[in-house]
């Protein structure tokens, strides 16, 4: 059973009851997942940007957008408009497929993994987790990478509070660390 199907059939009714909501449309849901990678070395090394774009495209299965500097910062040797990172926004079926792979395949492959921090919510039910190495994803071959780079994964939900967002992600299978 896919994550989307499981959400509709089991998670949504359970959250409706657990959060004591009156309408099925009030139940929090995942709106989008943003995968972002900032590349400081892209200012000097164009190959790293190209490699990052290819890696994110492999991981997400979607076209990657190159993010550019809004302002020139002399201390970082960056001019306005220079590429400094890349990002992908996933919605719909691709989002659910990515979340399922991330929760069930990628997270358990992290070394010394004891769960993700339950404190990384932003106050509005959105969750961000930083990944230190891209090789936890099964799509990335260790032999083909030039350097180990991390990324930020933000899960944007329709939850109004952190507790609602935490309940949603816990039901989806996100392994939160118990402090």
Curated annotation (Swiss-Prot):
Pfam families given in the database record: Ribosomal_L5, Ribosomal_L5_C
GO CC list: ribonucleoprotein complex; ribosome
Molecular function via GO: rRNA binding; structural constituent of ribosome; tRNA binding
Keywords: Ribonucleoprotein, Ribosomal protein, RNA-binding, rRNA-binding, tRNA-binding
Listed GO biological process terms: translation
Role summary: This is one of the proteins that bind and probably mediate the attachment of the 5S RNA into the large ribosomal subunit, where it forms part of the central protuberance. In the 70S ribosome it contacts protein S13 of the 30S subunit (bridge B1b), connecting the 2 subunits; this bridge is implicated in subunit movement. Contacts the P site tRNA; the 5S rRNA and some of its associated proteins might help stabilize positioning of ribosome-bound tRNAs.
Protein name: Large ribosomal subunit protein uL5
């Amino acid at each position: 059973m896919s994550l989307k199907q499981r959400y509709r059939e089991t998670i949504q009714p359970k959250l409706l009851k657990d959060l004591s909501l009156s309408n099925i449309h009030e139940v929090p849901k995942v709106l989008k997942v943003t995968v972002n990678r900032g590349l400081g070395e892209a200012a000097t090394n164009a190959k790293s940007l190209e490699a990052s774009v290819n890696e994110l495209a492999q991981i997400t299965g979607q076209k990657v957008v190159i993010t550019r500097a809004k302002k020139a910062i002399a201390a970082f040797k960056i001019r306005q408009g220079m590429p400094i990172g890349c990002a992908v926004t996933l919605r719909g079926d691709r989002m659910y497929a990515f979340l399922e792979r991330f929760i069930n395949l990628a997270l358990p492959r992290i070394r010394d993994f004891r769960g993700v921090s339950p404190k990384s919510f932003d106050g509005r039910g959105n969750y961000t987790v930083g990944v230190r190495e891209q090789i936890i994803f099964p799509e990335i071959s260790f032999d083909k990478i030039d350097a180990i780079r991390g990324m930020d994964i933000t899960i944007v939900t329709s939850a109004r509070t952190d507790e609602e967002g935490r309940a949603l992600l816990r039901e989806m299978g996100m392994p939160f660390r118990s402090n």
